[in-house]
């Protein structure tokens, strides 16, 4: 086997447009594709994360789980970590504050937020600096 890198991560969400808006407008990920089901309804939105990988947001009909806290101990995907430049950290933090998006955790390398459905998102410059 020869894994060549990260291809994509898919997250199931109920409010597809709202969640896609967070990743597009707040985090600046460019939208690259939209897919519709046989019924014509929007099924998924793909966003470019750079390096050839993408984030696929997939519509589901169930509501998101309540906020379990930063570390909930459940199996499964813990978070989506996106790389930022260390030099951009203060600007990104100010933009999150301006938009009213609270940090749920912070380390010297990473800021953690939640998307509109509660998925953990890490904005990290580790090991840069």
Where would I find each of the regions flagged by the language model?
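Vicinal oxygen chelate
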Residues: 16-17, 74-120, 127-128
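Residue-level structural signal for beta-strand termini and adjacent loop
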Residues: 37, 60, 124-126
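A short, acidic/glycine-rich surface segment
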Residues: 33, 42, 62-68
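Short, charged/polar surface micro-motifs in flexible loops or helix N-caps
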Residues: 50-55, 61-64, 87-89
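Short glycine-enriched loop/turn motifs at secondary-structure junctions
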Residues: 2-5, 73-77
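Core segments of cupin and vicinal oxygen chelate
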Residues: 12-54
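Short glycine-/small-residue motifs
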Residues: 54-57, 120-123
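Histidine-centered active-site/metal-ligand motif
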Residues: 7-8, 44, 55, 79
């Amino acid at each position: 086997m020869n894994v060549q890198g990260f291809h994509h991560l898919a997250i199931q969400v109920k409010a597809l447009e709202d969640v896609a808006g967070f990743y597009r407008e707040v985090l600046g990920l460019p939208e690259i594709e939209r897919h519709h089901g046989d019924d014509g309804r929007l099924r998924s939105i793909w966003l470019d994360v750079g390096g050839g990988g993408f984030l696929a947001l997939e519509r589901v009909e169930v509501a998101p789980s309540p906020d379990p806290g930063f570390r909930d101990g459940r199996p499964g995907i813990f978070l989506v970590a996106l790389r930022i430049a260390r030099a951009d950290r203060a600007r990104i933090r100010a933009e999150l504050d301006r938009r009213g998006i609270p940090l749920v955790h912070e380390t010297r390398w990473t800021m953690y937020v939640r998307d509109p459905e509660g998925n953990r998102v890490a904005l990290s410059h580790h090991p840069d600096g």
